[in-house]
Amino acid sequence: MSFAYTTQRILEIVGDDAEFSGEYIGEIAGIASLAEAMAGDLSFLGNPKYRDAVASSAASVLLLPRDYTETPKAGQLQIKLDNPSYALALLCRDMERSLQPLPAPGVHPTAFIDVDAIVSPAASIGPFCCIGKGAVVGAAVLEAHVCVGKYANVGDESHLFSQVVIGDYCVIGERNRLHPGCVIGSDGYGYEFIDGAHQRVPQIGNVVTEADVDVGANTAIDRARFGSTVIGAGTKIDNLVQIAHNV
């Protein structure tokens, strides 16, 4: 991945209340740790235990806390802020838009959409997606091989990465990010031991993820036995996590 950011563009992104020390004339073409940064790179101090590494860093631009007082090297710009780590996140968010742009709205010719499904004209439906009967998909992005079950709902501005499965009747809120391979709405683990054998208990509930939920790759969230397994607004779940039914 390649990019080029002027110091002026960096300052526009991180905010106009930053303080400056030193000067760097040129573009930033990389982001690296304090120890590994070279000329033309940007680095930051997010953890106080690495404070001593700032003085020896070769980075051309440094995002630092406001209380940092050491003098920058020649050709080095220090940008001092309340939260350098968050400032870096703002920069990366801007870079992501150009490095990984969202696909344009439209339906790939290999996708299958049931005649009774409703798909927003602002949605992007990727190759080999399958959208079931009665499903509703808002202005979302579905990458390749996503499956949305019968009567499921996907909210606006959500991004479903490759091979995500949304089970029947499940509800995905707005601005969700569901990473590759995660399964929302698989059966909960429900059995009764009857006459010497385990008998399956049907799981007739669903999963509801509220707004701004992130679910990591290959995570499974079980549908409820009845009612809903609810993932609250703003929840962030890592990769390879299993959420049991009715939580």
Question: What are the roles of these predicted feature ranges?
Answer:
Residues 44, 106-247:
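Structural signal for interior beta-strand "rungs" in well-ordered beta-sheet cores
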Residues 1-110, 175, 181-182, 187-199, ...:
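Terminal amphipathic alpha-helical/low-complexity segments used for targeting or macromolecular assembly
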